[in-house]
Amino acid sequence: MSELSRLRWLCRRGMKELDVVMSQYLDARYEAASELEKQSFKYLLDMQDPDLYALLLGQEIFPNNDIQSLVITLRTLKNRQ
């Protein structure tokens, strides 16, 4: 299984809202992203759905600036739908 296929599988979450946001980023931005942003995305994919959802809603702020920056990017993509 290629890395992109594996990531696409991991984008399938328990919540439809998360499926959409994570898959949209993977399709639109992942391949052109920096290595640091790719690592941040993989970190987010390893998070539990409620924690990730809280970040995307702005209910929580992640203490790592690189990951928080990606969360803001994900929110921006979500709002463009």
Task: Walk through the language-model features, giving the residues of each.
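Positively charged, polar, low-complexity stretches
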Residues: S2-Q81
